[in-house]
């Protein structure tokens, strides 16, 4: 086929694609465009006459101030969009702004108040607002149509009344609260709330953080990474239906997990002490005790090295609670010895699967395994994801698992190419307590 013929075929194929797209109903096109940033939606206006004004009918706005050369243009565009078909319901309203508008806080609050009032009237479903140091007007917290609320960098006022009967998802990142009660009031008005994510900022005005919800299924908490800022924080969780819990904090604060322990299925814990463990610090020991009891019924557990070290330090003073429901455990080791792992494993009588992520050479040596250990009588599957190089501490881990797991079915390990032959030879010398264990080398 000559070049002209190929061009005609490609042109015909292109026309067919355009015709197919052109034949789609307007409502479906708007639904597709709703998933794109508004700057890309506007670009479709040059496709054809049918598309010229279609972007105005899309029931959502998704704007980033960085796409505009001037702040005033950004504000004007939002105002223009809101003026189009003012009777149109909004499914999504998403704004991201990372600097002050001419440094005028009064103007910023006025803009936000105007837009929030408008989207509430237009029955908005999903609101996602990233803005600095503005206060969200109270009318938002009486929005009957809102399903998802995400706020970043703003200030949550002291709420006298909250009614968000349809909200299922809340994400609050670097939000400043008027006081301890602001978050409590917000949550209390969300009777069908299923997912709550909190990413805290320094000096957010909260000392006692209470999360109380009869409907909450997933809770993710990310405390401030600044040392010492939340030392005296009280975190209280009262969620009888909670299934998934994720906690990340520089240090374990005064925590209470009640009415949740029997419901939690999965927990991802990354919490350290923030300072050297003191066995004589009875209040801190009680905090650790209550915390471990609160998560002791989980089935799947992802645990960070710092948290495992907290557990080990506590175990030297008090017996650990039994994690009888735990069947899956994932752990990492960064600069601390894996030899603290068996202490925790012996509190998991029904553990079936163990995944070991990263393993690095420990900064300090321990003698935890100097004596005989209990058998891992329920362990069936182990995977070591980090490539092994044949180091002594790595082979000790493999030996411990193979020699103490009587029903182990499969051990999967990764070997570093540079030392594969050496590691393979060492593996062959390690005895296995389980005669049916399959060692898979990747």
Curated annotation (Swiss-Prot):
Residues 18-64 form the F-box domain. It comes from the Eukaryota. Disulfide bonds: none annotated. Residues 363-415 form the FBD domain. Coiled coil: none annotated. CDD domains: F-box_AtFBL13-like. Pfam families: F-box, FBD, LRR_At5g56370. This is FBD-associated F-box protein At1g66310. It comes from Arabidopsis thaliana (Mouse-ear cress).
